[in-house]
Amino acid sequence: MKLLLLCLGLILVHAHEEENDVVKGNFDISKISGDWYSILLASDIKEKIEENGSMRVFVKDIEVLSNSSLIFTMHTKVNGKCTKISLICNKTEKDGEYDVVHDGYNLFRIIETAYEDYIIFHLNNVNQEQEFQLMELYGRKPDVSPKVKEKFVRYCQGMEIPKENILDLTQVDRCLQARQSEAAQVSSAE
């Protein structure tokens, strides 16, 4: 019985520690540098994120610059071929908020992160007369826990993005081969 209570106590402590790792403000941007994988993608205009959509991109890594700007290295498919793109995103005055021009003007912010596990972004895009919003879930590994995915779905629902507009990118070609061949080229050059 004591062993059972001890195990239960340890489980509760561990669960509490995991929740404390989640950051929703006062972000330490240096901790988001490094490799990431696109996990879930959602938009209120689904065509933007479907195959051949202008916002269907697959993150490779994020680099933080000395002025707190971010460089996102991503892949997108052009005529069925994975193509590398880099986007420089400028820090705004608000915590965790950035802007970038890509298929219009984009203003995005970090919703929450557990630096070593996942990060969730919300983006608003304005392109001429059309506006849309987009949500992204990135993971440090090729997939994240169902609990994190459920949290992302709840955020999307809060932003009035329907569940059917959430794409699970772990089920599609995310250009992982292009990412691996780039890493192999870098290591052979060193």
Curated annotation (Swiss-Prot):
Transmembrane region(s): none
InterPro entries found in the cross-reference section: Calycin, Lipocalin, Lipocalin_CS, Lipocln_cytosolic_FA-bd_dom, Maj_urinary
UniProt keyword Signal present: yes
Signal sequence, renumbered to the chain: 1-15
Main location: secreted
Entry's Gene Ontology molecular function annotations: odorant binding; small molecule binding
Location in or out of the cell: Secreted
GO-annotated cellular components: extracellular region; extracellular space
Record key words, sorted: Allergen, Disulfide bond, Glycoprotein, Secreted, Signal
Ranges where the record places region IgE-binding: 43-54, 76-83, 91-97, 125-132, 139-152
Tissues and organs where the protein is expressed, per its UniProt entry: Expressed in saliva (at protein level). Expressed in dander (at protein level). According to PubMed:22104604, expressed in submaxillary gland. In contrast, according to PubMed:22515174, not expressed in submaxillary gland. Expressed in bladder and skin, but not in tongue.
Source organism, top-level taxon: Eukaryota
Keyword Signal set for record: yes
Known glycosylation sites: 52, 67, 90
Cystine pairs: 82-175
Region (No IgE-binding): 100-109
Subunit-structure text: Monomer.
Family, similarity comment: Belongs to the calycin superfamily. Lipocalin family.
Protein name according to UniProt: Lipocalin Can f 6.0101
Organism, scientific name: Canis lupus familiaris (Dog)
